[in-house]
Amino acid sequence: MTAAVATEELAAVEGVAFGYRLSDGNHRDVLRSVNLTLGRGDLVALVGTNGSGKTTLLRLLTGILQPDAGAVRFDGRPVAEWRRPELARRVAVLPQQLDLPVGFRVAELVEMGRAPHARRLFASTEADARAVSRALADAGALELADRYAEELSGGERQRLLVAMALAQEPDLLLLDEPTVHLDLAHQVALLAAIQHLRDQRGLTVLAVLHDLNLAAAFAPRVAILDDGRIVADGPPGDVLTPDVVQRVFGVAVDEARTADGRRHLALHEV
């Protein structure tokens, strides 16, 4: 067995607990003693059932939420010590849903994705222009630059959102179920583009995904969040086993092979 190569830590969640106070005065625990480390250049898929705390974990990494217990670090410093604009530039988020303003062209929206960290509406410096142009190219959105956002298809809209995130020139890219509104062909295309960007830019990527086979094909490392805890973390073949899937997701699956020999999970035939 080949030993794993250690990478320099970029972000870490250590012993983190988080919960919400409900309207009736009770407390709902969402995360319980979560541990997750992301090295520079890591590509990790985060999977779990609905309500297991995946989106909450992303919000803790952005500093939008603060943990009730434990520590969240980015680049060696507690997230709480970072100035929000500084952290927001280095940690980009591709959300499940983002309401875009009407009447703006794609290039203008990508400029907005770059500019808020400089306290202005549109990018204006030469460095801004280079970052916006590169973001459009890397996201495969150059041909969309003069289109209005409301004219875009689902797949084109996702390319716009990727470009807006890349315009920040982040170190960490967080994806919250980026494929949820796409058909299979566009899901595969988007994830392939993210893989390419990770390799090209050296990004660290943490992607919340709901399709286990897509997660296994996308990332060399998969973490499973169940009932507020990371219950498995490692290569897909070690983590996404039939017994783990049955225990966490309550679904009976079998390991199968595609025609070209790739492993995948198939529903168990009764």
Indicate where each model-derived feature is located.
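Conserved catalytic motifs of ABC-family nucleotide-binding domains
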Residues: 169
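Helix-to-loop junction immediately C-terminal to a conserved catalytic motif
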Residues: 62
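Catalytic Walker B motif of ABC-type/P-loop ATPase nucleotide-binding domains
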Residues: 173-177
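Conserved ABC ATPase "signature" region
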Residues: 111, 126-144
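Conserved ABC transporter NBD signature motif
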Residues: 70-78, 87
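The feature captures the beta-strand-to-loop junction immediately N-terminal to the Walker
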Residues: 47-49
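Conserved ABC ATPase signature
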Residues: 123, 148-152, 156
